[in-house]
């Protein structure tokens, strides 16, 4: 979780695997789940801004660093 923007690391229960791979769908799903889990708009925007500051690989890397993905879902 080296890419996590928070200390201590913050994650949400969201699995990127099995989602539509469209960047907007991933961001929207991640944002909705973060809101459900009580994240502040400031923290959500921090992750979204970092996610959209580069290419698609940066998006996936940043979002996955902020997700608690269950390995059994792979």
Task: Show the residue positions of the predicted features.
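Long, contiguous binding/interaction regions
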Residues: 1-74
């Amino acid at each position: 979780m080296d890419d996590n923007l928070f200390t201590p690391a913050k994650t949400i229960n969201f699995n990127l695997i099995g989602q539509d791979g469209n960047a907007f769908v991933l961001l929207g799903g991640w944002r909705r789940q973060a809101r459900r889990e009580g994240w502040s708009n400031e923290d959500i925007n921090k992750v979204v801004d970092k996610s959209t500051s580069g290419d698609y690989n940066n998006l996936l890397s940043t979002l996955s660093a902020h997700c608690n993905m269950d390995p059994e879902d792979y």
